[in-house]
């Protein structure tokens, strides 16, 4: 009975609980319904208020083409309650002029895309025309309703001024992906100047007056891909100015006044692929500056103040393909400066002060296809310097630009001839053709056949030398006579050509002794009492020409010819005409010389002096006749045989070949052992 009583009590308690639940649930449901009803009413009120405000704003959200009707000033001030319903927090007067309205009296005028009524603006280019556009100017309130704006550009016009970044105006534009400010007077980019813009991908602040970047000036833009600060006056950047920019790919800092780069400045830009630091005042580079830039493809350092590139400066730039170091003051590059640049394809060292390229410099650049060393002070290029990339030069579409240096014509350049013959690409051949060098003590045997007329002029072949008393002599080369006929050539004409045409041929580099002209004239007039005509037929009969080291010998009583060399028939154009025994020789040629250098002593001036040199194209010389000097003691600078050009330049290929041979030998041994074991079992 007790058990039945207990069961009955439990049943009654459960019944009471169920009844209570049924009574409470409708009450709570009604309460929730009441709250939903009040919520809908509240929302309806807000929407009504917003709608009213929107009507009063005269298409503030949409683009417009005219100002508010009935308002001469174009401004309508709304109540602060309407503004407070937004997210700007602004509680002052509003400018209700259509966002894309354009009038001459406006401080700021925007060109919109699309520029249609009742269509949300996606892109706007705004021109500033006023010097008095302050941060609290009501003109800025026109931006508060442009929630869908994605691209915004400010261009400050002449006689206008904007010396701040309108952070308060930009911040509410949450959909903004691109912001551009050009030609402003902004001097400092302050911390978080573009904060709270989650979709921002591009910031361009070029052609402004920016001088400094504060800490966190561009921090925490996790979607930013391009930052352009070119053509400013930046000289100081905080170490953490670019903090937390994980997706940034392109950074432009060129055309500023940057002299120092903090270590780790770009450490938070791991995705950076393009970095332009050209046209600055940078004078020192360290490996820590480029720490973390393993994805960088292009590094431009053109026109800075660099004079030395140290070891492993670019060691962490594993993906670098283009390195621009032109227009600096680089005197030396360390042998290991380019170590680790396995993907480098373009190296520009044009217009520096390099006198030598270390043999091991290109050892770490096996993929290099283009190297420019124009306009330096290089005296030679050795085979061993370019051996690591020789396969590329011969077999790939490669470029080697070497013009405008101070190369010496000697045996160290012999390998250039073989490279020109073996490369498959016309562009490389053409660039090598432009290689000029200085040949000391030129001889006719140095030159290829047929010898160009300009070279003969330089060597005084077919030229003339007028001999005067007191060991005074005058030499002339090339273009010594005007016209093709020698008929009627007088002594006055000869003296005239000696004094003027020769100097023109030598481009002003040759100067006559002060007394030589008068002495020659007097001597020639005394020795010749009458004029003689030289016939064209007489000229044609004189051959071959001679190479002359002309000098005046008082003991012999006249001119002597030394070291005469006969020339080929192909040079018959160079004739000689004689005025008689002991008379000056006059040669005829219509081509100016390239370049010559001379030295003289006393009143005597000879066309070929003890030390003379010419600046000439390398490929006008015979490679086997290039002089070798005793001072070339470095074995890596000695000439190479043709066979050495066949040696593969890529050390890795040599190692792989050796490895393959070793593997083949090992496999042979293993096969032999297996065969012996099978035979023994049999």
UniProtKB/Swiss-Prot annotation:
Keyword Ribosomal protein annotated: no
This protein's UniProt keywords: Cell adhesion, Cell membrane, Developmental protein, Glycoprotein, GPI-anchor, Leucine-rich repeat, Lipoprotein, Membrane, Repeat, Signal
Signal peptide start and end residues: 1-24
GO cellular component term of the entry, any: cell surface
One Pfam family from the record: LRR_8
Record's bilayer topology term: Lipid-anchor; GPI-anchor
Residue ranges of LRR repeats: 149-172, 173-196, 199-220, 223-244, 247-268, 271-292, 295-316, 319-342, 343-364, 367-388, 389-404
BP GO terms, sorted: axonal fasciculation; homophilic cell adhesion via plasma membrane adhesion molecules; synaptic target attraction
SMART domains xrefs: LRR_TYP, LRRCT
Organism: Drosophila melanogaster (Fruit fly)
Superkingdom to which the source organism belongs: Eukaryota
Matches recorded under PROSITE patterns: LRR
SUPFAM superfamilies the record matches: L domain-like
Domain LRRCT, chain residue ranges per copy: 405-462
Protein name: Connectin
Subcellular location: Cell membrane
Propeptide, residue positions: 659-682
Covalently attached lipid (GPI-anchor amidated alanine), positions: 658
Function: Cell adhesion protein involved in target recognition during neuromuscular development. Mediates homophilic cellular adhesion.
Region (Disordered): 29-54, 503-536
Main subcellular localisation: membrane
Tissues expressing the protein: Predominantly expressed in abdominal and thoracic segment muscle and motorneuron cells.
Skewed-composition ranges (Low complexity): 40-54
């Amino acid at each position: 009975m007790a058990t039945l009583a207990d069961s009955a009590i439990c049943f009654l308690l459960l019944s009471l609980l169920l009844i209570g639940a049924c009574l409470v649930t409708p009450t709570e449901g009604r309460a929730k319904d009441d709250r939903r009803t009040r919520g809908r009413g509240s929302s309806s009120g807000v929407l009504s208020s917003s709608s009213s405000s929107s009507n009063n704003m005269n298409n503030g959200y949409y683009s417009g083409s005219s100002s508010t009707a009935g308002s001469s000033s174009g401004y309508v001030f709304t109540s602060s309650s309407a503004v407070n319903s937004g997210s700007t927090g602004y509680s002052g007067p509003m400018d209700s002029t259509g966002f894309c309205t354009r009038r001459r009296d406006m401080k700021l005028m925007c060109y919109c895309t699309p520029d249609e009524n009742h269509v949300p603006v996606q892109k706007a280019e705004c021109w500033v025309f006023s010097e008095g556009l302050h941060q609290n100017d009501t003109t800025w309130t026109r931006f508060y309703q442009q929630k869908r704006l994605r691209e915004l550009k400010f261009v400050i016009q002449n006689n206008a001024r904007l010396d701040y970044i309108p952070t308060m105006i930009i911040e509410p534009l949450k959909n903004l992906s691109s912001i551009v400010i050009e030609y402003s007077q902004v001097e400092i980019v302050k911390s978080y100047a573009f904060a709270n813009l989650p979709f921002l991908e591009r910031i361009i602040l070029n052609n402004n007056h920016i001088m400094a970047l504060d800490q966190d000036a561009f921090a925490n833009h996790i979607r930013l891909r391009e930052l352009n600060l070119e053509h400013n006056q930046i000289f100081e950047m905080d170490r953490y100015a670019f903090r937390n920019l994980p997706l940034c790919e392109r950074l432009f800092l060129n055309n500023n006044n940057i002299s120092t780069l903090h270590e780790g400045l770009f450490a938070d830009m791991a995705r950076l692929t393009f970095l332009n630091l050209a046209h600055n005042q940078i004078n020192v580079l360290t490996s820590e500056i480029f720490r973390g830039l393993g994805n960088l493809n292009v590094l431009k350092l053109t026109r800075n103040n660099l004079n030395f590139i140290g070891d492993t400066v670019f060691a962490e730039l594993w993906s670098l393909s283009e390195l621009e170091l032109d227009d600096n003051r680089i005197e030396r590059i360390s042998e290991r400066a380019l170590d680790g640049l396995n993907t480098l394809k373009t190296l520009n060292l044009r217009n520096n002060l390099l006198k030598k390229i270390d043999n091991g410099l290109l050892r770490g650049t096996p993929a290099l296809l283009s190297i420019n060393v124009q306009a330096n002070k290089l005296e030679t290029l050795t085979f061993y310097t370019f051996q690591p990339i020789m396969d590329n030069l011969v077999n790939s579409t490669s470029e080697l630009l070497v013009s405008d240096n101070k190369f010496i014509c000697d045996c160290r350049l012999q390998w250039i001839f073989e490279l020109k013959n073996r490369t498959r690409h016309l562009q490389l051949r053409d660039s090598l053709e432009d290689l000029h060098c200085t040949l000391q003590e030129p001889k006719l045997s140095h030159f290829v056949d047929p010898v160009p007329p300009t070279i003969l002029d330089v060597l005084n072949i077919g030229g003339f030398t007028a001999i005067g008393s007191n060991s005074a002599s005058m030499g002339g080369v090339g273009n010594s006579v005007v016209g093709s006929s020698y008929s009627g050539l007088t002594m006055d004409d000869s003296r005239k050509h000696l004094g003027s045409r020769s100097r023109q041929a030598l481009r002003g580099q040759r100067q006559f002794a002060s007394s030589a002209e008068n002495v020659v004239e007097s001597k020639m007039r005394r020795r010749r009492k009458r004029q003689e005509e030289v016939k064209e037929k007489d000229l044609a009969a004189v051959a071959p020409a001679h190479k002359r080291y002309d000098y005046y010998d008082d003991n012999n009583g006249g001119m002597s010819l030394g070291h005469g060399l006969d020339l080929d028939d192909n040079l018959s154009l160079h004739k000689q005409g004689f005025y008689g025994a002991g008379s000056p020789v006059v040669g005829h040629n219509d081509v100016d010389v390239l370049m010559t250098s001379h030295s003289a002593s006393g009143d005597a001036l000879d066309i070929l002096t003890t030390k003379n040199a010419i600046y000439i194209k390398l490929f006008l010389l015979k490679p086997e006749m290039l002089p070798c000097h005793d001072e070339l003691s470095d074995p890596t600078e000695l000439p190479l045989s043709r066979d050495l050009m066949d040696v593969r330049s890529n050390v890795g290929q040599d190692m792989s070949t050796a490895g393959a041979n070793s593997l083949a030998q090992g496999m042979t041994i293993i096969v032999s052992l297996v065969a012996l074991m099978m035979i023994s079992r049999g």
